[in-house]
Amino acid sequence: MVEIDTASPPFDQLRSIQRLASARSGHASAEHARHQLYVARDKRSRSNVLVKIASKPGLVYEQELTNEIDSLSTINRDLPDSRYFPVLWEHGRLRDSRIYLIMSLFDEWPLATTISADRTPVSEAAHIRTMIEVGKALMELHGLNIFHVDLNPMNVLGRWVSGKPVIRIVDFESSYEVARHANGVFYNPPTTSAFLAPELPLHAPDARSDLFSLAAVLYTMLAGYDWTWAADVARSVRADPEVAPELKEILLTSVDADPEKRYSSVVEFRAALTAYFERTWPGRLRQRAD
């Protein structure tokens, strides 16, 4: 386990420091994990913050955190008013050379905490409405030529406020920023997630990679996690009799193994999903937006 010196910077400016619960992080807490997560309260701003620390000094342990720092720096600079993404407060190295970063801690919980195998029209409407909002967040991100790459039910946070979904996207350790990575900066894509687009890691990520993951998350919210154990997502969607034909076509187009056959952008996917929602639940989307 990572040991921290609460009397040394940056921890001397924090209080109530504790490990982040696995239900909120989705990260392993074992000693061999590449980094550890803490929550704390900043003494200066009185805001809650998330602290990430590499478990050991060295390039192997800090590559993902360095990548997250760089991507969040671009996002915060170019989208200063966006509420979808974390704000990077501070980053640097501890006295023992381990890299750290401090960012905003959101109140929302991972979508994974809302997933159930029980299906109802009410839950389907809520899940689709949530994904429409996630699509809006990804439109902002992709406008910067940054792709998240590792979207899954733990990396998308959400809650409902006054009948509308509030969405956050976190964990940019595997993100791909074209301005950096297409020009020689080392990139190490994730390799284990069932939500990962199949063309990775052999090809560079693009918007269609995130689209695959987003549709896989939506199907998981609708049907539960069983498909992640039994088969690939396209096969499961195709065989699922409880998915409406129009929605099934949207999902299958999004998770096609060939990225050339997917929607070309999240904008196109979101438009198709919005049209389906409005035909299925007329007026609901406009009422929620008012």
Which residue stretches match the model-derived regions?
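Conserved activation segment of eukaryotic-like protein kinases, specifically the C-terminal portion
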Residues: 184-199
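Catalytic-loop of the protein kinase fold
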Residues: 142-160
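Conserved HRD-motif arginine in the catalytic loop of eukaryotic-like protein kinases
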Residues: 262
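Conserved short submotifs of the Hanks-type protein kinase catalytic core
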Residues: 96-110
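Short beta-strand micro-motifs within the conserved protein kinase catalytic domain, predominantly
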Residues: 87-99
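Activation segment signature within eukaryotic-like protein kinase domains
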Residues: 130-131
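ATP-binding glycine-rich loop module of kinase domains
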Residues: 34-68
